[in-house]
């Protein structure tokens, strides 16, 4: 099971939110989310039985399949449209652009901890196409219009944007 290899003090991403394991008892482990985490993410709205994406920290000696994801959620977004596209689905999201976060077409974004490629982008939104395999192995297939998701923007893009702002 997932918990067999866990150790106290390790990080586990829960829908993209990095949380530290503080206790383990058999197949159950415990994490702590502080007020800041609950305010910036959708974790506070989860109910018992909700399915979340779980991912352990990456080892630095393995291949990077996706983009660099830290588990530091920047903000939430709302799903505004879902369109079937030959077995895949295109999800559209809007977010508050006043935070200064940006996405670019063919760039990377993390939605609920899933590394995805941006199909198109606007000032306050973007869309991603999700293949059947990813839909089957994540909780993205459960999204509906109006669902709130956690976003982590590309860390390299965030640093570049900050450097440009400071000039």
Segment roles from a protein language model:
Residues 1-167:
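Conserved loop->alpha-helix
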